[in-house]
Amino acid sequence: MANQKGGVGKTTTTINLAASLATFEKTVLVVDADPQANASSGLGVDIKEIDCSLYECIIDHADVHDAVYTTDINGLDVIPSHIDLVGAEIEMLNLKNRERVIKNMLDQIRDDYDYILVDCSPSLGLITVNALTAADSVIIPVQCEYFALEGITKLLNTIKIIKSKLNPALEIEGFLLTMYDSRLRLANQIYDEVKRHFQELVFKTVIQRNVKLSESPSHGLPVILYDADSAGSKNHLALAKEIINKNEKRVNKQDDGSTQEIQ
């Protein structure tokens, strides 16, 4: 989950997409790669009480299994972040294969999960480069407000470089419109502009602006546990369905088999 522009809904999407995928009985791991650790707290993890985080895995070579914590949702685990991650990029400069540290770490547990979601900070630093090097694909949240496309060109250039130098398999999973309000002309203009630029790469699902969705992180809960009937909950369930169906079609196409969509 990446976009160098802050406040576009990366963390909110990570938390609630993960919970929604788990609702469809998928095993999911959230990796919180943002020093603010909002994805960790939004999933109910008290970072003051943990012994091992992403930082210890990267810098101290801690066993990744020791950094995996369960959540209140069955099938959903998290590797939490820590404020110490702020200085990790400097500490990583002397590491061998420093761009592949997170990939090598996640390769140890990749087969334990159907989906691994990495919440990146709003920067294109070494931690984000690590996340993109480890990823199969990138979801790019785009806020339905002024300057929505600001910074996306730079992100796309970074993805292009990583694809050519570090991770040839890296793809764009899709652009996700967030904080959408159909009553606002601007929101509809942004939607049309993003659709015109990126066409089939834009998710059909949009995430509407929603009070319950904004409130749920302060309670340490995904919105599906905070208010299952809210628009925020329904939007993320729809997004999870779209991603599951897209990926199952992709797998079945490779296997030359048939697929059955989630309804």
Located regions from the model:
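P-loop NTP-binding core
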Residues: M1-Q263
